[in-house]
Amino acid sequence: MLTPKKWLLGVLVVSGMLGAQKTNAVPRPKLVVGLVVDQMRWDYLYRYYSKYGEGGFKRMLNTGYSLNNVHIDYVPTVTAIGHTSIFTGSVPSIHGIAGNDWYDKELGKSVYCTSDETVQPVGTTSNSVGQHSPRNLWSTTVTDQLGLATNFTSKVVGVSLKDRASILPAGHNPTGAFWFDDTTGKFITSTYYTKELPKWVNDFNNKNVPAQLVANGWNTLLPINQYTESSEDNVEWEGLLGSKKTPTFPYTDLAKDYEAKKGLIRTTPFGNTLTLQMADAAIDGNQMGVDDITDFLTVNLASTDYVGHNFGPNSIEVEDTYLRLDRDLADFFNNLDKKVGKGNYLVFLSADHGAAHSVGFMQAHKMPTGFFVEDMKKEMNAKLKQKFGADNIIAAAMNYQVYFDRKVLADSKLELDDVRDYVMTELKKEPSVLYVLSTDEIWESSIPEPIKSRVINGYNWKRSGDIQIISKDGYLSAYSKKGTTHSVWNSYDSHIPLLFMGWGIKQGESNQPYHMTDIAPTVSSLLKIQFPSGAVGKPITEVIGR
């Protein structure tokens, strides 16, 4: 018979066991938020510092930990690889994402990084927009590892205007990944994740937030004469936006232009506002950060990239985009304070790559610059035809790499080495070229570090080209005659911000050298979970406190 004394003893024992379990639980934040500001050069933190408010970038700098000397440790420095490397702690040679696109030597065609014809679009009828998944990714992400550590009870969501910047950070088995459809102005996904859009996504889409954001056009946040960190408003090296005939403020017809082409919102600061509002909706819709099981939200802020590409780093448009993003971040952090609680969430902010100054801007200030070969594939194929008598020997030229068509070589009875040597010799004559490397012989190449290591890390034997080209400093692809671009090893493309704030983070900064690939191991160490499967980086001891 169970006496009152024995019953009370049993209750005390069970209560003690439950208390011990709670006490011994691994200390983790309720929510991790990984923010990637697309194309954010490290110096943007300080170029516009005097105009930032206290709640956005300055909050991270003044209450969090800033790493001032973080570089990307591979080439090419592009969006898909950047997001993959941040969240895998790995490099293209291992994780398999060798570019936004690459040439598939077996299929004989260009392949987009997240393209997947085995899945169907959800939320749109456009296959090109919706047929995407992480199947081309060979390694696990830190978000995957969190799922493995919690027996997949953690909620993981990726949000971006860009498909690749939502899909790759969220990993192989997230709760969801959502991206923007230019044809409808709504967020969508694919059947890789779900058969139908969750109610919270439909509710958000039905609010028609993009139209509301562009309704009043785009004018400068501050009086335009205060944008002293930027060039004058009307310069020849800036691109146009919408129906405006000059690259100048104000952009009064934005609402009309958006209705004609909904993807236009990408090239305005309001694309970032939209993304962060969608991120807020994801937190609410998935009840993220409400219990002791850590959740993970990945957010790519893509409009900084689109605005940067179109106008260039020294434009008033870019400065205004960052000042508005600063305010959006302050609102987002305030919402996290209310929903999750100060000290209960961990945020890190970085970038997938930087950007070069516009060629026109550099020329105006007597800096070394120029354009890379206008149409290298066409020009070189003409020379190869004359030399070897075969057409289309070069199958593709992308990511500063040259791919040879193996079938053409075989049919023409040509040796790869002979053709490659000839092309390398010809490329070395180009004034824009610094080095030309055979990807079969990178280890033996007599080029300095860190270029050599970055080429090795970026080379994927299955997906990269036969020749790697290193351009001279300041030389941009010919398609970037307006605005700017990125892809190279130089500091303007490879030097990125890295800030941590919130749970478990002390205030401070470090000038010690670190790499993009150190981010995922650092987050893994803070969460006390296994590193991603292909990680080559190491935890940043200043951040984790030991």
Swiss-Prot record:
Residues 1-25 form the signal peptide. The active site is at residue 79. Substrate binds at residues 100, 162-164. Optimum pH is 8.5 with 4-nitrophenyl phosphate as substrate. Has 50% residual activity at pH 7.5 and 30% at pH 9.0, being virtually inactive at pH 10 and at pH 5 or lower. Binds 2 Zn(2+) ions. Pfam families: Phosphodiest. Transmembrane segments: none annotated. Zn(2+) 1 binds at residues 38, 79, 352-353. Zn(2+) 2 binds at residues 305, 309, 486. This is Alkaline phosphatase PafA. One of its GO terms (cellular component) is periplasmic space. GO terms for molecular function: alkaline phosphatase activity; carbohydrate phosphatase activity; glucose-1-phosphatase activity; glucose-6-phosphatase activity; metal ion binding; sugar-phosphatase activity; zinc ion binding. SUPFAM superfamilies: Alkaline phosphatase-like. The keyword Lipid metabolism does not apply. Its main location: periplasm.
